[in-house]
Amino acid sequence: MSPTLDDQSPMEIRCTEEGAGPGIFRMELGDQRQSISQSQRWCCLQRGCVILGVLGLLAGAGIASWLLVLYLWPAASPSISGTLQEEEMTLNCPGVSREEELLPSLPKTVSFRINGEDLLLQVQVRARPDWLLVCHEGWSPALGMHICKSLGHIRLTQHKAVNLSDIKLNRSQEFAQLSARPGGLVEESWKPSANCPSGRIVSLKCSECGARPLASRIVGGQAVASGRWPWQASVMLGSRHTCGASVLAPHWVVTAAHCMYSFRLSRLSSWRVHAGLVSHGAVRQHQGTMVEKIIPHPLYSAQNHDYDVALLQLRTPINFSDTVGAVCLPAKEQHFPWGSQCWVSGWGHTDPSHTHSSDTLQDTMVPLLSTYLCNSSCMYSGALTHRMLCAGYLDGRADACQGDSGGPLVCPSGDTWHLVGVVSWGRGCAEPNRPGVYAKVAEFLDWIHDTVQVR
């Protein structure tokens, strides 16, 4: 029979220190003290050691955890840089592969530029610091087209020979001659020379792109003025905005393949492309341009949005002006480093909770992030392919959203803007560790040029 509370005094358990040795405890039951035998002392000693050991381990683990948190916790900073974000994610996501950082970057053997009012073609050979004027000997329109495409332009518009006697040159000016090797690579065909035998050099003009004549946020974005992004277009099905697009040439725009795939059963005559719009309220005064042909990338995957680009050929050309123009493609081998400040624009949702697109064009600045970072276990766990890139903030302050798909992600190189990405997909909008994912335009240059040239 168990004693009742009335039968005995309340039990009190407490530990007291016994003897000179610290940490050795004995148990007392209320005031009923008893003498402790030698075996009982030895038992208490063993138990005390066990308790001390456990407490010591717990204390050590606590201190170690505290130091680890102090060491690994990312410091808050208002500025965003690609390096800082990558460091944070590398520390917090063990096992992240840095494979792409280990890939050697090959030095460019030749660079081109078009300089001055005379549009003189210049070449920089084998990393020499000086720019060489190109001699006209051996020149061909095909070579001009190749150079224009390597600079991010869609096509060659004009080329001619210029007499050296008609321009002022520095005495130290040197030239580049084409080698006579048939079938050689363009990048290996240039030879520095002190003069041009014919006394003529090359003037080259490519299709205009990447300029913002009137240039003076999307979630977290701001409304933009007319002409700020002259290549921005709206792809409409009837009177409904479905996706953004970017103007490449008067007859061509590029958008996301998933935009067209979602409405693949729609009649071609129902599609219109509107360029130069800032507000969709002006659509009634803007007839738009009918779509002649929809050309999604042949390898597009609806499962993971790989190869998520499509070209739209227009029935009539877009009229270029101060508020409407083409964006440049990435120049050949052009690299925008992680952390580069780029811009995304569109008419998508301005708040993740909204169900309707914005009536006015929005834009926001986002930094480029490395693919290894976005493929980490903290973000997209390997979902990005080599045809994708991502941009945004780890804290989710600004991002593209529904309705922005197909629109441009552009990055500046001097005063020229290049189409680096096409808005493709993401998980949520402006959520932490969920930046926007874009089709990487540099991976589609050959397909774009081949498609545009043969039609």
Curated annotation (Swiss-Prot):
Phylogenetic placement of the source organism: Eukaryota, Metazoa, Chordata, Craniata, Vertebrata
Positions marked as site (Cleavage): R217, I218
Organism in which the protein naturally occurs: Mus musculus (Mouse)
The keyword Transmembrane belongs to this UniProt entry's keyword annotation: yes
Residue ranges constituting the SRCR domain according to the UniProt record: 112-207
The EC number(s) this enzyme carries: 3.4.21.-
Function: May play a role in hearing.
Keywords: Cell membrane, Disulfide bond, Glycoprotein, Hydrolase, Membrane, Protease, Serine protease, Signal-anchor, Transmembrane, Transmembrane helix
Principal location: membrane
Signal peptide range in chain numbering: none
Entries under InterPro entries matching the protein: Peptidase_S1_PA (IPR009003), Peptidase_S1_PA_chymotrypsin (IPR043504), Peptidase_S1A (IPR001314), SRCR (IPR001190), SRCR-like_dom_sf (IPR036772), Trypsin_dom (IPR001254), TRYPSIN_HIS (IPR018114), TRYPSIN_SER (IPR033116)
SUPFAM superfamilies reported in the protein's UniProt record: SRCR-like, Trypsin-like serine proteases
Record's bilayer topology term: Single-pass type II membrane protein
Gene coding for it: Tmprss5
Residues at the active site: H258 (charge relay system), D308 (charge relay system), S405 (charge relay system)
Family named by the database record: Belongs to the peptidase S1 family.
GO molecular function: serine-type endopeptidase activity
Protein name: Transmembrane protease serine 5
Extracellular compartment spans: 71-455
One GO cellular component, as annotated: plasma membrane
